[in-house]
Swiss-Prot record:
Known pathway: Pyrimidine metabolism; UMP biosynthesis via de novo pathway; (S)-dihydroorotate from bicarbonate: step 3/3
Family: Belongs to the metallo-dependent hydrolases superfamily. DHOase family. Class I DHOase subfamily.
High-level lineage: Bacteria, Bacillati, Bacillota, Bacilli, Lactobacillales
InterPro entries registered for this protein in UniProt: Amidohydro-rel, DHOase, DHOase/Allantoinase_Hydrolase, Dihydroorotase_CS, Metal-dep_hydrolase_composite, Metal_Hydrolase
Name of the protein: Dihydroorotase
Gene that encodes it: pyrC
Organism: Lactobacillus helveticus (strain DPC 4571)
Length: 425
């Protein structure tokens, strides 16, 4: 059967064109005008995009499925227009052996409704200085390496890890955090920490480890990717490293682009995340970094928690914010429609073809004949409200609930099959 998406504004190769999209046998067959098919999806007045790509999600499965599981996490991704995600390995048990990795990859495929690529850990159990067998993990299905949630504390361990990752052509995606400098902090070091009387987090906890790792990456030649950069100095370090030819890429998270420490209204656990919300100066540097290419992509760091884990104030709340279901609409509303900081084409690139390109996910994040029919359709014209009852994730820990947005997802397709449709649970 052939399905045609008619009369949409299609994002293709960095451009927006008025076109139809023809789907057959789970793939894009053609993009053009006056196309016909057995089934017609009317996209008049809608944006037709490649399925978005999020290289940074936490699905808590196995080990903490009361927070999220593969099924609900992938449903949340589809609700946000994402059809390809990278799942972090900070689950229980950590997939640090070939058998555990194979099981994770199999579970992702069986339970997920989107394409889920699985990270392996940089170190065994994410908390030791012992390296797993990277070659075996890659053979079992690991697409990259990360200890996200933990910084690699020992320089020698990271140096050895980068050498082995380079040998096995694996990306090292780092959560840059020096625990001795983080020092159990909660809020960015500044006036807000003083106002709330909460332990501060110095930006040095992030920047010193980035500086260290950039030197190690230069020495080893590994592809070093930095997760959720959040400070002006981090951006400056990456900019200098790229100018020196170091093989480094990095991502920014939607919440660090949209919010600052000044937006924390009170001691509210929904605003507790790691890295913390930073200053307006840091936020401005992130936006400049995206626009000048220093920051390569946007990734959500979708980190769901049970409701009770985010209550009782920031001191006791868990770190983390959800993002899969709110990323595109909140970023589009703020930076494209209202403030006109980005173009729609730029935003779509940072959320689709760029993350796919950085991580070597061939045929993801693009609409081209022969590619999988992974498609997202968005409504840019009508205002809606973000409501808890509409979330597909088990986690509702986002401060964006109640916000009026444009860019709600109308439909998401994976391999030509509808996996999300607005109005249907």
């Amino acid at each position: 059967m052939q399905t045609v998406i008619k009369n949409g504004t299609v994002y293709q190769n960095g451009r927006l064109i008025h076109a139809d999209v023809l789907i057959e046998d789970q793939k894009i067959k053609a993009i053009g005008t006056d196309l016909t098919g057995d089934k017609v999806i009317d996209a008049t007045g809608k944006l037709v995009s490649p399925g978005l790509v999020d290289v940074h999600v936490h699905y808590r499965d196995p080990g903490q499925t009361y927070k999220e599981d593969i099924e609900t996490g992938s449903k949340a991704a589809a609700h946000g227009g994402f059809t390809t995600v990278g799942a972090m390995p900070n689950v229980t048990p950590v997939p640090d052996t070939p058998d555990l990795m194979k099981k994770m990859v199999q579970e992702n495929k069986q339970k997920g409704i989107v394409h889920i690529f699985q990270y392996g850990p940089i170190t065994k159990n994410e908390t030791t200085d012992e390296l797993p067998d990277y070659a075996a993990l890659k053979k079992a299905g690991a697409f990259a390496l990360s200890n996200d949630g933990h910084g690699v504390q020992t320089a020698q361990t990271m140096y050895l890890a980068m050498q082995e990752a380079k040998k096995n052509d694996l990306i090292v995606a780092a959560h840059a955090q020096d625990d001795s400098l983080f020092n159990h902090g909660i809020v960015n070091e500044g006036e807000k920490a003083k106002e709330l009387n909460l332990p501060p987090v110095t930006e040095l906890a992030e920047t010193t480890q980035i500086a260290r790792d950039l030197l190690l990456a230069e020495k080893t030649g590994v592809h070093y990717h930095i997760c959720h950069v959040s400070t002006k100095t981090s951006v400056e370090l990456v900019r200098m490293a790229k100018a020196c030819g170091i093989n480094v890429t990095c991502e920014a998270a939607p919440h660090h682009l949209l919010l600052t420490e000044d937006d924390i209204p009170k001691d509210n656990g929904y605003y507790k995340m790691n890295p913390p919300l930073r200053s307006k100066e840091d936020q401005a540097a992130l936006l400049v970094g995206l626009l000048d290419g220093t920051i390569d992509l946007i990734a959500t760091d979708h980190a769901p928690h049970a409701k009770q884990e985010k209550q009782g104030g920031m001191q006791n709340a868990a770190f983390g914010i959800t993002g899969s279901e709110t990323a595109f609409s909140t970023l589009y509303t703020k930076f494209v429609k209202e403030d006109k900081v980005f173009t729609l084409e730029q935003l779509l690139s940072w959320l689709s073809d760029q993350p796919a390109k950085v991580f070597g996910l061939k045929k993801a994040g693009v609409l081209e004949p022969g590619c999988p029919a992974d498609v997202a359709i968005f409504d840019l014209e009508h205002e809606t409200e973000l409501k808890e009852k509409d979330y597909q994730s088990k986690g509702i820990n986002t401060p964006f609930t109640g916000q009026k947005i444009y860019g709600a997802t109308v439909m998401t397709m994976v391999d030509g099959e509808v996996v999300y449709q607005r109005g249907e649970k």
